[in-house]
Amino acid sequence: MLILASSSISRANLLKTAKIDFKQVGFDYDENLDKNISPFLYVQKIVLEKEKQFLSALSKDFQNQNLLFADSIVCIDEKILTKAKDKKEAYEMLALQNGKYASILSAFLLVKPEKRVFSLSKTTLYFKNFDENALNDYVENNLYKSKAGCIMCEGFHQNFITQQVGNLSTALGLDIQTLKAYL
């Protein structure tokens, strides 16, 4: 059995859809890292920091188990977008994407008793212009919350994607194809 060390609903749904036996263990991570580094390095550091925090608090409970740590960020050029703190920040992030593109970087660390596997994947989504009413509904109903870069591929953004380069599962927060290869 896999231990998903995350409270992410999207990642749990991806594992269920892939028929991977898992148990979800939520943990409140401190994800405050310096964003003045490359997005690729940033997301990897976040995942390693999640592992460190989780194991320092709960290592006795999860010895010799298969643990999965993951994180996703959105970047536009080299600008890192994490989760919006409020509606103002959500509107700012969505304005950067409107009629443009955004890349989702998803990293995971699979810790097994006999090995460690680290993966970094990228999916780029190209968007047509957002409908203003749909955009306002999305933000005002707080649907952007807990979404990296306010991107909701399975919801709001779905109607505005004109091109996808990379796996949908990466955009949703976990490269399932790569993970399955190492389970």
UniProtKB/Swiss-Prot annotation:
Localization per record: Cytoplasm
Domain of life: Bacteria
Pfam families tied to this protein: Maf (PF02545)
Catalytic activity: a ribonucleoside 5'-triphosphate + H2O = a ribonucleoside 5'-phosphate + diphosphate + H(+); a 2'-deoxyribonucleoside 5'-triphosphate + H2O = a 2'-deoxyribonucleoside 5'-phosphate + diphosphate + H(+)
GO molecular function: nucleoside triphosphate diphosphatase activity
Enzyme Commission designation: 3.6.1.9
Cofactor entry: a divalent metal cation
Keywords per UniProt: Cytoplasm, Hydrolase, Nucleotide metabolism
Single GO BP term: nucleotide metabolic process
Main location: cytoplasm
Family stated for the protein in its record: Belongs to the Maf family.
Name of protein: Nucleoside triphosphate pyrophosphatase
The organism of origin for this protein: Campylobacter jejuni subsp. doylei (strain ATCC BAA-1458 / RM4099 / 269.97)
